[in-house]
Amino acid sequence: LGEILRLAVRDPSYMMIFAGFFSCGYQIAFITAHFPALVTEMSAPIDPLGWCGDLGIETTAALGGFAISVIGAANIIGTLMAGWAGKRFGKKWLLSGIYAGRSIAAAWFILTPITANTVLIFSFAMGFLWLATVPLTSGLVAHIYGIRYMATLYGIVFFSHQVGSFVGVYLGGV
């Protein structure tokens, strides 16, 4: 086990997986902790005659809660599709696309006015990419190092995800 750990920490591929999952945790925790409050405080007023009113969303606080539920629903779809795609296409390229997609979605959201429509679009896009990294990351670790060491090496990568989560929540509140 010691030998494979030394090999992994010297492997640029493993360190990229480690760093990627750190950023994944950062993004997810940052959005989970701070996005509903951002929507509540910064969103344009809700149009009671629009689609929000049809869904019973009458306040920006309700829109923030709805946004998290959209992220959750889209996450189911995105994660299943990522697992399916990971069997057919290169996992590292799919992971790169997911991380790039998150960056594009975040940049788009930052550059647009915060309305119910932009919140919904961002929530779906981010939700679709939310945990789509998990089957690809674990599959990539297993592919590179084999099933025998997958649990240990993926566990270390997952630890980086949790550290990234802490940093994302903490820095968002500073």
PLM-predicted stretches and their roles:
Residues 6-83, 134, 168-169:
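Extracytoplasmic gate region of multi-pass secondary transporters
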